[in-house]
Regions:
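Hydrophobic adenine-recognition pocket in adenosine-nucleotide-binding enzymes
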Residues: 65-67
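Acetyl-CoA-dependent GNAT
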Residues: 3-63, 103, 120
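Conserved GNAT acetyl-CoA-binding A-motif
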Residues: 88-102
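Conserved acetyl-CoA pyrophosphate-binding loop and the N-cap/start of the following alpha-helix
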Residues: 71, 75-83
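Conserved N-terminal entry element of GNAT/NAT acetyltransferase domains
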Residues: 1-10, 138-147
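A conserved beta-turn-beta hairpin within the catalytic core of GNAT-like acetyltransferases
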Residues: 55-63, 72, 125-129
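Conserved active-site tyrosine of GNAT-family acetyltransferases
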Residues: 17, 109-110, 114
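Conserved catalytic-core motifs of GNAT/GCN5-like acyltransferases
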Residues: 97-99, 115-132
Length: 147
């Protein structure tokens, strides 16, 4: 029997996934060190932006950067990325990964020093062409992901 579920995985499924992943990783001398994070930036006690993501193995992933429309192009996105980079730079991670669509912010990430790794073109709707970026830490002391 095969089942499809929409939405978050049940606790039973999460437990199974964690157990199998952990066993496999340990057999290969790897540890995922997975955790989710969020960073908020405020002005006058109001949240104006959020950067959220997760870490796994030796990498930091950015899932969302959202700035309220009234605060865009005022440097808040750059401040969030800089805070993220400073937070993880000396914590044993190798790099930060993020992706964005054509209609979002590919040039913003390039201006922030992120290198384009590849582009996945959407031939039906070019606005949904996906850009994948990375920024490597210069710190050679990478120890995350090793058990």
């Amino acid at each position: 029997m095969i089942e499809f579920q929409k939405g978050s995985a049940s606790s039973k499924i999460k437990k199974f996934l964690n157990q199998v992943h952990e066993e496999y990783e340990q057999s290969n001398g790897i540890s995922d060190k997975y955790f989710e994070y969020s960073i908020t930036i405020s002005s006058e006690n109001e949240i104006v932006g959020v950067l959220s993501g997760y870490t796994v193995f030796s990498e930091v992933y950015v899932e969302n950067i959202v700035i309220h429309r009234n605060y865009r192009e005022k440097g808040y996105g750059k401040k969030l990325l800089k805070f993220l980079e400073d937070k993880f730079e000396n914590e044993g991670y190798n790099n930060i990964n993020l992706s964005t669509s054509e209609f979002q912010a590919p040039t913003f990430y390039e201006k922030c020093g992120y290198k384009l790794e590849f582009v996945r073109k959407n031939k039906i709707n070019p606005k949904l062409t996906k850009y994948f970026f990375v920024k490597f830490f210069d710190n050679p002391n990478q120890y995350m992901g090793v058990s």
